[in-house]
Regions:
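FIC/Doc superfamily catalytic core
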Residues: 1-218
C-alpha cells in the first residue's frame, strides 16, 4: 500500500508527497504490533490506577512534564538538563546553560496544550499555538516564524534539499495534508488510541509543517 510518492520538484530535488491520510484501505498491523499495543495499554491502565493513590497528583504531573521537556529538548540538541531547569527555577543560575530557556518554553507549551483541549477538540489552530508557545521566547525560534505554517521548503539532514536525507512535501501541499491530519484527529477511527497516536505522530513528522520544532510539537 503506497502512503505517498517521491516527486521530482522543479528545483531539482525529490520531495515526499503524502497520499490520502489515512488510506481508504484500513492499515494492517503485525501480531507483534498488536501485542505491543496491548501491553502498553495495560501499562497505562496500571499507571492510571496508581495515580489515583498519589496524594498530590499535580506535583507528580508537573515533575513528569519537566522531565519530558528536558529529555525531548536534549534530543533536539539542548545542553541544559532537568537538573539545570530545577536549579534555574529556584534562582540558582550559576553555571546553567543559556538554552535552559528551551526547557521552560517546552513546559509552557505542554501546559498550554493540555489546558486548551479541556474545552475544545485538538485542532490545527491549537497545534500552531502550542508551537508558538514553545518557540517564541527562545533563540532557536528567531527567524523561524513560531506558530506559522512554513511557506518555504525545509529538509532533514544534509545542507540543502539536493543532498538531504529526506525532503518533506513542498509548502503548497500543506493545506491538503494538514487538513487530512486534522480530520483524522477528531473523527472516529478503527484504531486503538495508541496506534492512532503513533500514526498521527508519524504523519506529522513526515509533513514537517513548521520550519523548526516539529519533533517536539508532534
Amino acid at each position: 500500500m503506497l502512503l505517498g510518492n517521491f516527486v521530482q520538484q522543479p528545483q531539482g530535488y525529490k520531495a515526499f508527497i503524502p497520499g490520502q491520510f489515512p488510506p481508504k484501505e484500513m492499515l494492517a498491523f503485525s501480531p507483534a504490533v498488536h501485542l505491543t499495543n496491548d501491553r502498553a495499554t495495560l501499562a497505562l491502565g496500571k499507571l492510571d490506577g496508581i495515580a489515583q493513590l498519589i496524594p498530590d497528583i499535580d506535583y507528580f504531573l508537573s515533575t513528569y512534564i519537566q522531565k519530558e521537556a528536558a529529555v525531548s529538548s536534549n534530543i533536539e540538541g539542548t545542553k541544559a538538563t532537568m537538573h539545570d531547569a530545577l536549579r534555574a527555577d529556584i534562582g540558582m543560575t550559576a553555571y546553567i546553560p543559556e538554552d535552559v530557556e528551551n526547557i521552560f518554553s517546552y513546559i509552557n507549551a505542554i501546559n498550554y496544550g493540555v489546558a486548551a483541549v479541556q474545552d475544545s477538540p485538538l485542532t490545527l489552530r491549537i497545534i500552531r499555538q502550542v508551537h508558538e508557545e514553545m518557540m517564541k521566547n527562545t533563540r532557536e525560534g528567531i527567524g523561524k516564524t513560531p506558530g506559522e505554517i512554513r511557506k518555504t521548503q525545509n529538509w532533514i539532514g544534509g545542507t540543502r534539499p539536493e543532498n538531504a536525507l529526506f525532503v518533506p512535501p513542498p509548502a503548497h501541499e500543506l493545506p491538503r495534508v494538514l487538513s487530512d491530519i486534522e480530520k483524522f484527529l477528531n473523527l472516529p477511527q478503527p484504531y486503538s488510541p495508541l496506534i492512532k497516536a503513533a500514526l498521527l505522530h508519524a504523519q506529522f513528522e513526515t509533513v514537517h509543517p513548521f520550519l523548526d520544532g516539529n519533533g517536539r510539537t508532534g
